[in-house]
Every structure is written in structure tokens, then in C-alpha cells.
Amino acid sequence: MSKNDISAYMSEWMRDREESPIVMSSRIRLARNLENHVHPLMFLSEQDGFRIINEVQDALPDLAVQRLDAMDQQSKYKLVAKHLISPELIRQPASAVLLNEDESLSIMVNEEDHLRIQAMGNDLSLSSLYEKASEIDDKLDSELDVSFDETLGYLTTCPTNIGTGMRASVMLHLPGLTIMKRMNRIAQTINRFGFTIRGIYGEGSHVYGHIYQISNQLTLGKTEEDIIESLSEVVQQIINEEMQIRERLNRHNYTETLDRVYRSLGILKYSRLISMEEASLRLSEVKLGIDLEYIELEDFKFNELMVAIQSPFLLDDEDDRTVNEKRADILREHIN
């Protein structure tokens, strides 16, 4: 898989930004349900599910629809790897995703709620992402009968989403805080203020490559602007702590950190078999070394490699190499 091949897999909003070494991406997600339809988790029939898909498609004709029942498993999991759909959407019998041209907008149909509107970007621009998601929300609201209560707000399947129905989240690369074992303390602290830390694919997912998703937990009684402002403040505090820890590692643990970086670089350069878990760890430590200016690598794309080394992009019926072997081959080709 060449560097051009990797870039072809990526949505534009997922690409690396040199000016943002810690913030990988941001997302605004709005949960909505439709009146006169059974909720997806309450035995939604395939017939009703496909009827909802058609209604949403008619309301948003400018977006491309992909029905998951028409896709093979590998194609579905590629969408998961690119953060365009959730693993939960795959498990629904009648589900779909609508995407705009650059894939910065994704509308999941018949996941936990009838609609999950997602706007995504590769910086900390939560307010502009909310405006983007809100524009789609307004279009749907003008065409469809969306469930809304004057007292409670938007009615959702999960009680924690009732109110604005909004989840704001930011993906951060936090190797310093992880190495110094600070993440549990941070998780406990922000939890008291209504925020949570999850893995790379949200609730219940594993942490790979020292990448964490920070998001709000509750929406009832808060405005969208309140949630965005509070999350932005929390994220900035975490970024500041990560920068302080990196400075400490550089000053007081220089040799140990340098050794960690070069060991990982050597494994990526020379391994012939490597698992997803180890590959993401080694990529993270090499990225830390680049950020601390210990090493220079030409055209090192952390975000893109973290997607490209996932199994859905490595499976090929015409190639008898194992996934771990192909992953190692890709990394050797790109780490120079």
C-alpha cells in the first residue's frame, strides 16, 4: 500500500495538521427520532426501517446514501475505521448512512436513534461543526416530524441524550499523560463536571495509540453553546497538562523517553509481524519523538497510518499474507 493509496482511503477532515499535534479531530453529533415510528432498539421491523431510510433520503437529496444491507462486511468496517459510522449501526437489520462529498457530514439512520447527525473536522472548531450539523437538523425538521417535547427537549432512546440530544467530542493524542499514568485521575476529575473519556471508537471501545475521546455525558438542562464552551475549556486544560508532561519528560526523563522513541522506531522499521495494538503504540511513541523534535521523519502521517493499519483495509482474498504481516509491510514502507 503506497502513500498515495493511504491518502485515498482518508476523508479530508481526518488528515494530519502539523499545527495541531495533540488535537486529532472534533465531532458534533445530534440524536433525533421521528414520530409515528418504532425506535430502532424496540424491535424496529425491516420494512419500517427501510421506510425511514427513504424518508430521510427524500429530505436530504444532496447527500449520497449507502444502505448497509447492500454492503459486504469489509466495506462496513472500513466506514467504522474512518469514524463515519458506529459499530452499533452494523448490527441493525435496516440501516444506512448518508454522506456529503468530503465525508465531513455523516447521518446514520436507524442506529440507537432514528437519526445520528455527525459533523466532523480535524481541529477544535466545535462551534462551526455545530452550525454545520444544525443546518442539516433544520432541513430534516422542516421535512420530517421529529420527536420533541416542550419541557424535555428532543426525545432520544438513551435518557442521557434527552434535551439537546447533542454529543460534542474531541479526539486527543495523549502519550505523555498515559506514560506518566495520569489518565485515571483526569477521567475521575472531568467526570465530576459531566464529561467522560472513552476509547477511539467511543463508549466501550479500546484505547489504541494513546488516543482518547473526550465528550459530554449529559444534555438535559444545558444549551448547545454551554456544552461546547465547557468541553472546549476541559479539552484545553487537558492539552495544557499534556504539554507540561511532555516538557517534564524532556527535561527530567530525557534518556528514557529518547530510548522509548527509538525502540519504537526500530520495531516499526524492521518488524515482519505486528499486531494492531502494538503498531498503534509504536506509532504513538514515534509521533511523540517527532513532536519533541528528537527525530525527523519525512511525511510521517500519524492519523492516516492509524486508519490504514486497521484490519478492514488489509483484508484481501487474493493476498495470502496474514493481517499482521501486511500491517508490518505497510509500516516498513512508510517509516523512513
Curated annotation (Swiss-Prot):
InterPro entries: Arg_Kinase, ATP-guanido_PTrfase, ATP-guanido_PTrfase_AS, ATP-guanido_PTrfase_cat, Gln_synth/guanido_kin_cat_dom. It catalyses: L-arginyl-[protein] + ATP = N(omega)-phospho-L-arginyl-[protein] + ADP + H(+). One of its GO terms (molecular function) is ATP binding. CDD domains: bacterial_phosphagen_kinase. Pfam families: ATP-gua_Ptrans. Signal peptide: none annotated. Keywords: ATP-binding, Kinase, Nucleotide-binding, Transferase. Residues 22-245 form the Phosphagen kinase C-terminal domain. GO terms for biological process: phosphocreatine biosynthetic process. One of its GO terms (cellular component) is extracellular space. Its EC number is 2.7.14.1. ATP binds at residues 25-29, 83, 116, 167-171, 198-203. Catalyzes the specific phosphorylation of arginine residues in proteins. Belongs to the ATP:guanido phosphotransferase family. HAMAP family: Prot_Arg_kinase. PANTHER family: ARGININE KINASE 1-RELATED, ARGININE OR CREATINE KINASE. This is Protein-arginine kinase.
